[in-house]
UniProtKB/Swiss-Prot annotation:
GO biological process, one term: negative regulation of DNA-templated transcription
Effect of L134P: Does not regulate the S10 operon in vivo
Protein name: Large ribosomal subunit protein uL4
Organism encoding this protein: Escherichia coli (strain K12)
One Pfam match: Ribosomal_L4
Length: 201
């Protein structure tokens, strides 16, 4: 199959297995959920009644005071007491096979092509690391919410995009399923397309 280059009167021949396969919604969902789960810190921790600082002495005698019986100031019922089912640090990551991960990326890229959300260009750059230059370039292309993928990370482009809210710049090795579906449009250079094809082959 061929992808038309927007900034040139030509087309780029690409593999149909990478850019023309059927959309596997279940696979994409599984991989995206796993990717998001892997980004969780999982560092939350609370103290049980055994870990809270405080005396082990019984606050008052069992009977005769008229107050409710109590055996410890560290009881979860008490203010500043321990937590009954205390949270523990945990690893939320889920295992995803390479074949599944690549399959999900191919599905997403193919769907982007079908929905006309993937724009392929010969090259994409700015002369200087200026947000104004990139903003004007995107305005000329009628792009606002966009992920730009280049063959190699262009420092000028990267710095120019940092202050734009709905714009991100990645090199071909930095793509992931979440970022591909997070933006309205994806702009890829011809070099990036070839690199992605080789990565997913």
């Amino acid at each position: 199959m061929e992808l038309v280059l927007k900034d040139a009167q030509s087309a780029l021949t690409v593999s149909e297995t990478t850019f023309g396969r059927d959309f596997n919604e279940a696979l994409v969902h599984q991989v995206v959920v796993a990717y998001a789960a892997g980004a969780r810190q999982g560092t939350r921790a609370q103290k049980t009644r055994a870990e809270v600082t405080g005396s082990g002495k019984k606050p008052w005698r069992q009977k005769g005071t008229g107050r409710a019986r109590s055996g410890s100031i560290k009881s979860p019922i008490w203010r500043s007491g321990g937590v009954t089912f205390a949270a523990r640090p945990q690893d939320h990551s889920q295992k995803v096979n390479k074949k599944m991960y690549r399959g999900a990326l191919k599905s997403i890229l193919s769907e982007l092509v079908r929905q006309d959300r993937l724009i392929v260009v010969e090259k994409f750059s700015v002369e200087a690391p200026k947000t104004k230059l990139l903003a004007q370039k995107l305005k000329d292309m009628a792009l606002e919410d966009v992920l730009i993928i280049t063959g190699e990370l262009d420092e000028n482009l990267f710095l120019a995009a940092r202050n734009l809210h709905k714009v991100d710049v990645r090199d071909a090795t930095g793509i992931d399923p979440v970022s591909l579906i997070a933006f309205d449009k994806v702009v890829m250079t011809a070099d990036a397309v070839k690199q992605v094809e080789e990565m997913l082959a």
